[in-house]
Amino acid sequence: MDLLVDELFADMNADGASPPPPRPAGGPKNTPAAPPLYATGRLSQAQLMPSPPMPVPPAALFNRLLDDLGFSAGPALCTMLDTWNEDLFSALPTNADLYRECKFLSTLPSDVVEWGDAYVPERTQIDIRAHGDVAFPTLPATRDGLGLYYEALSRFFHAELRAREESYRTVLANFCSALYRYLRASVRQLHRQAHMRGRDRDLGEMLRATIADRYYRETARLARVLFLHLYLFLTREILWAAYAEQMMRPDLFDCLCCDLESWRQLAGLFQPFMFVNGALTVRGVPIEARRLRELNHIREHLNLPLVRSAATEEPGAPLTTPPTLHGNQARASGYFMVLIRAKLDSYSSFTTSPSEAVMREHAYSRARTKNNYGSTIEGLLDLPDDDAPEEAGLAAPRLSFLPAGHTRRLSTAPPTDVSLGDELHLDGEDVAMAHADALDDFDLDMLGDGDSPGPGFTPHDSAPYGALDMADFEFEQMFTDALGIDEYGG
C-alpha cells in the first residue's frame, strides 16, 4: 500500500500538481467546496470548480465530483430515472461535435494511454455556469409574438447549453486524467509485485487490459452524473426564470392552442411554454388529463415548473399522479444513456476507418471484446416513424388562438407551501378566521379591475429580465423560498 501511495505522489510531482485547496475552515469535513445550489433565476452568478482531483480510487473520485458540483442528490436522481418510462432527453441536442477531438474517450486503450501520459490537467478556474452570446428573451407585448418568443427562448437554451458543456467537457477530462493516473499507479504496483515473485509480465499489456476492464465503466459513471447536473440545473434555471414572467401574463396564454409534432416535445425537460390554456394536442389529438398529471409528477420530482393547461386539466383533480412503470418499455435512464453515449462515442465514430464503420453498424460482425461505454435496450428499439429522433430536431409547435369570447382560465392555483385560513397562527395565539370567510364572496369587479384594463394601463413591466438590479434579485429569492421552489435540492 505504501508503494502505491508513493506512486500516486510521484505522478503528482511529475505533472507539477499542487495539493487541493483546503475545505472551508470551521465547518464539518464534508463541507462542499463548490458554491451553494443555483439560486432560481440568477443567470449571471458564476460557479467555479475547485482544482483538479488527485488520483484516488474510483469511488472516492466519484464522491469528489459530487462534492465539487454540490450535487449530493445525483445518484438518487439517476436511480429515480430508472422508475419512469418517459423520454425526457431525446429532444435535447447531443452537441457530439464538441467531443470529436477528445482522445481520452477513445475506445482504444492505447489511445487512452497515450493521452493520459501526456495530458496536463487544466488548473485555471473553470466556470460551469458560462454563458453563450444569446440574450435572455422577454415576453412579447401581445400574443402574436409568442411564436418568436418560443424560438428565441429555445435559441437561448441551446446557446447556454453549448457554452456550459464546453466547461463540463474540461471537468470530465480532468477527472478522467485522475482516473487514468490511479489505474496506472495500481498497475505499476501489481507489475512490481509480479516481478518480485518471479513472474515477468508486460507492463503495457497489463495497463491496456486494466483500462479496458475499468476505465470505460468508471468514465461512463462520471459522465452520467456530470451531464445530469448540466441538463437538470440549466433547465431549472432558465424555466423558473421564464415561469416567473409567464405567470404574470395570463392574458397571453388564456387562448393559446399548441399542437406538437411529437409527445417527446412535451415530455422533454425543456418546455418553453408552461401555460397552454386553449388546447394542448399532439398532431391534432388532445393530451389526456391523466398523461399530463403523470408528466407533471415527474417534473415536480425534478423541481421543474409544471405544464398547465385549462383545456386538459380536470376540475377538482390533483395536478400530479404517479406514473405506472412498464417493465417492457424503455425507461428515462436508458434514453439518458443514449444521449450520453452519443458524446462518449463521438471521438471513436469520427476517427473510425470505413471497414471499422461497417463492423459498428452490423451487430453480427462486432468483435466480442470491443470496448464500449455500455448499452441499453433503448438503443435497440424500433421507434415509430412519427417519434423517431432526427438530427435536425423536431419542428416547432403550431400555435393558434381560440376565437374571442372563448377565454379559458386555470381552475387550480399553482401549488405552494403557503397555508392560510385556520392553519394560520400568529405568535402562538388562536385567531378566529370566521370574519375572513367574507373575502370569499367579495366581488373584485366592484373595484373596476375587470379582465379588460382601462386606457393607458400597462399590463406588464416592459423592463428586460437582465435589467433587474440586485435588490430585485434578493426580493425574488425571498419570494421563491416562500414558494418552496428549491425544496427538492440537488
UniProtKB/Swiss-Prot annotation:
The keyword Transcription applies. The keyword Transcription regulation applies. SUPFAM superfamilies: Conserved core of transcriptional regulatory protein vp16. GO terms for biological process: biological process involved in interaction with host; DNA-templated viral transcription; positive regulation of DNA-templated transcription; positive regulation of transcription by RNA polymerase II; protein-containing complex assembly; regulation of viral transcription. Changing residue 413 to P: In strain: Nonneuroinvasive mutant HF10. The record marks 442 as: Critical role in activation. Residues 12-35 are annotated as: Disordered. Keywords: DNA-binding, Host nucleus, Host-virus interaction, Phosphoprotein, Transcription, Transcription regulation, Virion, Virion tegument. Residues 411-490 are annotated as: Transcriptional activation. Pfam families: Alpha_TIF (PF02232), HSV_VP16_C (PF12149). It comes from the Viruses. The transcriptional activation region seems to target many proteins of the RNA polymerase II transcription machinery. Interacts with tegument protein VP22. Interacts with gH (via C-terminus). Interacts with the virion host shutoff protein (vhs). Interacts with VP11/12. Associates with the VP16-induced complex; binding to host HCFC1 activates VP16 for association with the octamer motif-binding host protein POU2F1, to form a multiprotein-DNA complex responsible for activating transcription of the viral immediate early genes. Interacts with host P-TEFb; this interaction recruits P-TEFb to the viral alpha-gene promoters and overcomes transcriptional inhibition by ICP22 and promotes transcription of IE genes. This is Tegument protein VP16. The lineage of its organism: Viruses, Duplodnaviria, Heunggongvirae, Peploviricota, Herviviricetes.
